[in-house]
Regions:
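Membrane-proximal helix-loop-helix units in multi-pass membrane proteins
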Residues: 87-157
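Membrane-water interface at the C-terminal end of transmembrane alpha helices
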Residues: 116-130, 173-188
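N-terminal topogenic module of multi-pass integral membrane proteins
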Residues: 1-83
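Membrane-interface helix caps and helix-loop-helix hairpins in membrane proteins
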Residues: 38-40, 150-159, 208-210
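Structural signature of hydrophobic alpha-helical transmembrane segments
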Residues: 41-52, 100-111, 157-168
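Central hydrophobic cores of alpha-helical transmembrane segments
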Residues: 72-83, 135-143, 185-199
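Hydrophobic cores of alpha-helical transmembrane segments in multi-pass inner/ER membrane proteins
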Residues: 52-62, 110-123, 167-175
Length: 212
């Protein structure tokens, strides 16, 4: 079993492990967000966009046996981690309390609640069939969209965000190959990414919006 096979399906995701995972992720992100010189770099991106959090959710989803278990554990992970991110930044003096409360109640609070139904759906990514492949592809599309937005920033200010670009696109390939074992299902996942991304770009074009 490779490292990635172990990570996506070979771990014992107990409740204590979920809580410790959430604490570790929250503290790390909070520290990265508190170091001002890191703001234009990939190390700070975990505090701004979702790429790492998608990966964390996939790790939990692929190591749960049932959908309800996945939903609850994903919810608890974000319930623990996100307030910690803001708490660390407030204590470090890089974020004022009222802004932290606003960001959490406006963004991550509602997003955390959505992980309950989201976790039920995300649990399907481990299924070795077309449905699992499609759900995985839709999740991977979030990584692709984030990666494309950072490509634009990378072109504008090289080499900032290079590691995040590599993480996004490399993560899609690694997770697809590690989670879906059959070639035909991997093809379905990659095809889903293409279709979903093209559809998103068409919607943005039709509404006069841009990706970045």
């Amino acid at each position: 079993m490779s490292l990635f096979d172990k990570l996506f399906g070979g771990l014992r995701m107990s409740w204590p492990a979920v809580v410790l995972f959430g604490v570790g992720a929250g503290l790390y992100a909070g520290v990265m967000g508190s170091i001002k010189p890191l703001e234009p770099t990939s190390l700070h991106d975990i505090c701004v966009t979702m790429e790492w959090w998608v990966i964390f959710a996939f790790v939990i989803a692929t190591n749960c046996e049932k959908g309800c278990e996945c939903a609850l554990k994903t919810f608890v992970f974000f319930l623990v981690s996100q307030p910690l991110v803001y708490a660390v930044e407030v204590l470090a003096g890089t974020l004022v309390l009222d802004r932290a409360i606003y960001y959490y109640t406006a963004i991550w609070g509602p997003a955390t609640l959505l992980t309950l139904p989201g976790g039920l759906v995300a649990h399907l990514i481990g299924r070795q069939d077309p449905l699992g492949a499609v759900v995985l592809g839709l999740g991977d599309t979030l990584m692709v969209v984030t990666g494309c937005s950072y490509v634009v920033r990378l072109v504008q200010e090289p080499p900032f965000h290079l590691l995040t670009v590599i993480l996004c696109f490399g993560g899609v390939v690694v997770m697809t190959l590690a989670i879906q074992k059959e070639k035909k299902n991997r093809i379905v996942s990659f095809a889903t990414i293409v279709v979903a991304f093209v559809a998103l770009m068409a919607i943005l074009a039709a509404t006069g919006r841009v990706l970045v």
